[in-house]
Amino acid sequence: MASLSPGFHGRSSRSLVDRLPPGQYPTESFPVLSAGPTPHVPTERWSFTVTSETGASRSWTWEEMTALPQEQPVVDIHCVTRWSKFDTRWQGVSLDVLTDAVRTSADFVVAESFDGYTTNLPRADITGGRAWLVHSFDGYPLSPDHGGPARLLIPHLYFWKSAKWVRGLRFTTDNEPGFWERAGYHDYGDPWREQRYRGDL
């Protein structure tokens, strides 16, 4: 059985006002927003692959992934459409565990999903205990509407960077814009700097 640890985030002692990025409003609900139809991927057909810039790769089945050490991060999430949800509870695997399985010197990574969605990220933003591959939300398996069976969780960036239905990470030497980034969204997406669209500082 996989071990459990709480992750580096916990319930913050800061006031809710201090935790709300500019231009955001708090919500108790969990809105569903997607770029296209919702894929339904059975866990017996699910796999996750990390590929280096040289083509070397490491893959995990569902059983192998859920047997890895598990963390339970409690984090605030912020959508580019201006809602924020505080103290969301997840369970999954630190991306440090998965990315350490391949040797890479690349500075960038592209997250790739089962529906063809992609999003680009600096390598530094998915390592150092700040990002996860999660499969449970609030104590229950993650539903397809919210990215199940597994999605990325990168809470310090706008939530479009936390790719739903994710199937892998591909390291790249050059920065390769993803789906929303090519459509005009900001390349990085820091909610505290309101980096919603291309051209925002």
What annotation goes with each model-predicted range?
Residues 2-201:
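Structured, non-membrane catalytic/scaffold regions adjacent to prosthetic-group chemistry
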